[in-house]
Amino acid sequence: MRWRDRIAVLCFPPGLMLTVAALILFFIHMGVFASDVHNFCVIHNYDHMSFRYTVVLIFSQVISIGWAAMGSLYAEMTGDKFLRCFALTILILNGAMFFNRLCLEFLAINYREERH
């Protein structure tokens, strides 16, 4: 194994790389979601919300859920209980973040809907 190969996997155990990538994406989504909730609920400044990037955010969250699901399936094939619990937790967190983002988007659409 060359030194580049070791750097590429960051010395994680096999199968954990997908779960860690999903965890990193979860933290990014959490930051964007917290900013949007703050702009929507606290300061009511809707121009700073991430409406222009909704498609990218939803697609990124679906990719994150897919990576977490693949990491969870790989963890189920191993005998490590900690890895299984960690992977399932990341999968559940990503799924919850997806539905929270979806609810916030629909809430914002209903709030901004013009009534004549």
From Swiss-Prot:
Report TM segments. Answer: 17-38, 52-72, 85-107
Q: Kindly report the protein's main subcellular placement as a broad class.
A: membrane
Q: How does it sit in the membrane?
A: Multi-pass membrane protein
Transmembrane helix found in the keyword field = yes
Extracellular topological domain: 39-51, 108-116
Superkingdom of origin: Eukaryota
Subcellular localization(s) per the UniProt record: Cell projection, Cilium, Flagellum membrane
Keyword Amino-acid biosynthesis tagged: no
Q: Which InterPro entries match?
A: TM262
**Cytoplasmic face residues:** 1-16, 73-84
GO cellular component terms given for this protein: CatSper complex; motile cilium
The protein's UniProt keywords, in alphabetical order, are:
Cell membrane, Cell projection, Cilium, Flagellum, Membrane, Transmembrane, Transmembrane helix
- Stated role: Auxiliary component of the CatSper complex, a complex involved in sperm cell hyperactivation.
Quaternary structure, from the entry: Component of the CatSper complex or CatSpermasome composed of the core pore-forming members CATSPER1, CATSPER2, CATSPER3 and CATSPER4 as well as auxiliary members CATSPERB, CATSPERG, CATSPERD, CATSPERE, CATSPERZ, C2CD6/CATSPERT, SLCO6C1, TMEM249, TMEM262 and EFCAB9. HSPA1 may be an additional auxiliary complex member. The core complex members CATSPER1, CATSPER2, CATSPER3 and CATSPER4 form a heterotetrameric channel.
Q: What is this protein called?
A: Cation channel sperm-associated auxiliary subunit TMEM262
Organism listed in the record: Mus musculus
Q: Which gene encodes it?
A: Tmem262
